[in-house]
């Protein structure tokens, strides 16, 4: 299926590009998330009429993400989780836990889908570098310090 991208999508393209994607990806992700529209003649004409407005919205989103990224870059988040004597956690620290911790620390707008854990969930006590993708162009490094709670 061919779609018109309404915003920059990682590993796919930029605003206004007509790209070919799998039908399921378009129907289940891109179109419902308002990241793309089906590429028909009418949709292309409508897009060209709204192009300036969409580019302005994209620039505002990028500026907001960069401002949040400057505040968030190098931040150290402390997460307390129950742990055994050997330093292994009972349970794990997920990207949802990290996003929640960042939101409570005052970084509004961080979603769990933006938190990238390179080695999967955190299952031990320690310090772990992670990345937060606030925008397709804004990637921020954050350190998560997992502390063990003893009963």
From Swiss-Prot:
What are the BP-aspect GO terms?
Answer: translation
Annotated coiled-coil positions are none
Work out whether the entry's keyword set contains Phosphoprotein. no
Which top-rank group of organisms is this from?
Answer: Bacteria
The question of whether Cytoplasm is a record keyword is answered with no
Q: Which GO terms describe its cellular component?
A: ribonucleoprotein complex; ribosome
Q: Which UniProt keywords apply?
A: Ribonucleoprotein, Ribosomal protein, RNA-binding, rRNA-binding
GO MF, any single term = rRNA binding
Against InterPro entries, the record matches this protein to: Ribosomal_bL9, Ribosomal_bL9/RNase_H1_N, Ribosomal_bL9_bac/chp, Ribosomal_bL9_C, Ribosomal_bL9_C_sf, Ribosomal_bL9_N, Ribosomal_bL9_N_sf
Recorded hits in Pfam families, A to Z, give: Ribosomal_L9_C, Ribosomal_L9_N
Family to which the UniProt record says this protein belongs? Belongs to the bacterial ribosomal protein bL9 family.
Q: What does this protein do?
A: Binds to the 23S rRNA.
Q: Which PANTHER family match?
A: 50S RIBOSOMAL PROTEIN L9
- Protein name per UniProt: Large ribosomal subunit protein bL9
Q: Which species is this UniProt entry from?
A: Bordetella avium (strain 197N)
């Amino acid at each position: 299926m061919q779609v018109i991208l309404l915003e920059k999508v990682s590993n796919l393209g930029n605003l206004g590009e007509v790209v070919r994607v799998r039908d399921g990806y378009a129907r289940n992700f891109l179109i419902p998330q308002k990241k793309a529209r089906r590429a028909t003649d009418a949709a292309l004409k409508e897009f060209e009429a709204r192009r300036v407005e969409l580019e302005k919205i994209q620039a505002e989103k990028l500026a907001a993400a960069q401002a949040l990224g400057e505040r968030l870059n190098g931040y150290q988040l402390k997460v307390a989780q129950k742990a055994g004597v050997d330093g292994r956690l009972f349970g794990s620290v997920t990207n949802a836990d990290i996003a929640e911790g960042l939101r409570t620390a005052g970084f509004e707008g961080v979603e769990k889908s933006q938190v990238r854990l390179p080695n999967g969930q955190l299952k031990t006590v320690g310090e772990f570098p992670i990345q937060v993708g606030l925008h397709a162009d804004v990637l921020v490094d954050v350190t998560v310090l997992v502390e063990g709670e003893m009963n």
